[in-house]
A protein has these predicted regions:
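Positively charged n-region of N-terminal signal peptides that target proteins for export
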Residues: 1-4
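Flexible, solvent-exposed loop/hinge segments and secondary-structure transition points
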Residues: 19-126, 132-136, 140-156
Length: 156
């Protein structure tokens, strides 16, 4: 038996569903050029979920996703030939709050960090009030990608 919702109930329910909030800040190509200006990129497939490119100038460009509070955050990490972060870029942010992780001053904290650096929120990386989970998960993601470089990419 098929249930029918009267219009006076169905319409308000449909209107009360929150719209997904997604902001695309940079395309893949824009993020690549932001972190490695003038470089060309060669994709590297090594069977993992992260998308990885070797930069013609030396170094690596990796795109990854982490969970914010409820939604995925797509970010990119540039790693120099010595295994240190050149910087991070936020490509797409889907949360309704906490978009401050895109601010240059927050992202700049990662520059120069390597796999041996602690990268702990509230110690090495400043937290943003109202964006704690986004900050924590991006920080953990960057640390994971720096470890990935050490274990998988450095010898390539």
């Amino acid at each position: 038996m098929s249930a029918r919702w009267p219009a006076f109930i169905a319409a308000p329910l449909a209107l009360s569903v929150p719209a997904a909030h997604a902001t695309v800040y940079l395309s893949l190509e824009q993020a690549q050029q932001s972190l490695f200006a003038g470089a060309s990129f060669t994709p590297v497939d090594f069977g993992r979920r992260e998308r990885v490119w070797r930069a013609s100038q030396g170094g690596w460009f990796i795109v990854d996703q982490v969970l914010g509070k409820h939604e995925l955050i797509t970010y990119a990490l540039g790693i120099d030939p010595q295994g240190r972060a050149r910087g991070i870029e936020i490509l797409e942010y889907r949360e309704s709050h906490g978009g401050e992780v895109r601010h240059t001053s927050w992202r700049a904290q990662f520059s120069g960090k390597g796999a041996a650096d602690p990268l702990q929120l509230d110690h090495d990386i400043r937290n943003i009030s109202g964006a704690t989970l986004s900050c924590r998960h991006i920080t953990d993601g960057v640390k994971r990608l720096l470890k990935l470089y050490e274990s998988e990419l450095r010898q390539r």
